[in-house]
Amino acid sequence: MGGGVAVCRNPRRPAVELGCKGITANAILAGAIRTDRWDPLTPEQVQERRDRYPAGKESSSEEIAAAVRFLCSDEARTITGVELPVDSGIGVCLLKYNKDWIANDPYNVKYWERK
C-alpha cells in the first residue's frame, strides 16, 4: 500500500488481516521528489535543500518505483507490515530541521499561511 498518509500510514493492521491470504501490506514513505514545483527555486535554494538530506540529494521517482517493485517481488514475499522510508534520510533528522525549514522556506510559509 502507498500513495500517501491518507491511504495508509500504518500497514500493520492490514498485514495481520490479509497475511493469511498471502497478501502483504507495506507502506512506502516517500520523501521529497524533484518536480516542477522546484522550478522557481534558484540553484542555491536547491542545493540548500539537498544539503539537509543525509544522502545529499532528493529521492527520484525511479528510486520510489524501485522500492515498490522490490516490495511487490518474490524476494519480499515475507516482508509485511513495514513502513519503508525512501526519503534520502531526511526522516531520521527531520525534527532537527523542521522548525527552521518551515520558518525560512518561502513555499512552506505560504503553505502554512493557507491553513
Stretches found by the model and what they are:
Residues 1-17, 70:
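Conserved catalytic helix of short-chain dehydrogenase/reductases
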Residues 16-20, 33, 59, 72:
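A short hydrophobic alpha-helix cap/turn motif
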Residues 19, 24, 79-81:
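Short, small/polar-rich loop/turn modules that mediate ligand/substrate recognition or access, typified
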Residues 20, 30-53, 94-115:
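A glycine/serine/threonine-rich, flexible loop-to-helix segment
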Residues 77-93:
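Short-chain dehydrogenase/reductase
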Residues 53-64, 75:
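A conserved structural motif in NAD(P)-dependent oxidoreductases
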Residues 24-34, 72, 85-87:
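Conserved SDR Rossmann-fold cofactor-binding beta-strand/turn motif
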